[in-house]
């Protein structure tokens, strides 16, 4: 069976990648990632039970989160580390099973497929012996890559035959992947929430349960949105408690003459460690793509060698990384196949990986040693200037709420007629130029609220301001879409409205990968309707599932700039 992947917006032909991923992943990588998800589901079966009887599940919790994150689009292309993850997962699964048995669980080793119902309350249907059949995901084991390959052939997306059940299972899984990404960053800063892990396990097990109806899976998808809000709130707390609340900041997009390191991705802990270790070395630090919002945090502003932001969204990295001249640290997605001309300057860390590039692992105390990349930078030329000037950002919820009187007055007087939430992701497709044109053509009495790398389609345009309020308010990274929700809820309260949809806010969101999926589900949980997704609707939505979203939530897509602006403004 050939590979099949349709988790990102660029799925081939709007249907799915079957030969090689548009992202660059090979068939082997795609299938290994399918197997990782299957192993994670097996672990979830046991960790759910272990949690119920009070056993420590921290190792499994961490593995589930990291594994889901490692399969996000453009995160990891390293076959060796992905296969090692499968092997590690099988060991964790066995360890959990042994711990449950030791704690009093009953396991029929001869039949190798039944546990007593006392310890399998989340599995299957009771048989006439008051036992439940255990899923293959819980019992499958192997110890070599060849067996991994054979198993991977049988556990991919298309293993679920019913199109609608498959669609809902994948929608739920992709929401969990996005949730895992945000939880990983919070965990790295010492913040966690057991209820989020418990839901993730419950949802993973549910994707194995053939007795669940489409309605039951739909309810789980919406529940996923609730935990999406929770995880974004947790990460917001982690980031702001550690580094302060983002504040209005002018960010330099030019360069200096010192050698530099470019840091990309989302992990602020890595950002902090890199700034500390480069201080006094003569090496400058620049952010790239989704790391741009690090410039807004007060804690990072004390570093004089933190220059600003270099370049644009992730998909332009082939050209921009070449021009940067120095080494690049990829802390998370998005990494694309590097050119030979700069591949030796790429370093990965965390769950990110690419075959043939250097990976920086943490030591036993959790800290990372960036000395190799720092010494590498010293041997490199300074960055080539590709832009100059400044961009402004830092409009997360705390900053915007500080401006609330000014914003509310502008709405009441009619100076601001409507807000447009244009959060989300950027990507390669030329049709995404729609978002640049949309921003340009919006009436001058409108304000764009953004988060994520979608901002690069318009954050360098001169769109002016309204009574001193910039017409593009950048809250931060994709997870800072949480800030946009907080702002909307506060405005609802200020204007004494019953329904969040009564606000003069329209949602025109560009999506790309699975973090955008959890943001969407979170917005649906908060009651937001009439969200428009583009440049295309997800390939993983079957016609019937798409119909549910359209009929119940008013989900739509984009058409032309003129038609859409007219529709939104009416």
From Swiss-Prot:
GO BP: response to hydrogen peroxide
EC number: 1.7.99.1
GO molecular function, one term: 4 iron, 4 sulfur cluster binding
Binding site for hybrid [4Fe-2O-2S] cluster: 266, 290, 334, 425, 453, 478, 513, 515
Residues holding [4Fe-4S] cluster: 5, 8, 17, 23
Pfam families: Prismane
Keyword Metal-binding in record: yes
Keyword annotations: 4Fe-4S, Cytoplasm, Iron, Iron-sulfur, Metal-binding, Oxidoreductase
InterPro entries the record matches: HCP/CODH (IPR004137), Hydroxylam_reduct (IPR010048), Prismane-like_a/b-sand (IPR016099), Prismane-like_sf (IPR011254), Prismane_a-bundle (IPR016100)
Superkingdom, natural source: Bacteria
Family named by the database record: Belongs to the HCP family.
PANTHER family: HYDROXYLAMINE REDUCTASE
Name of the protein in question: Hydroxylamine reductase
Organism: Clostridium botulinum (strain Loch Maree / Type A3)
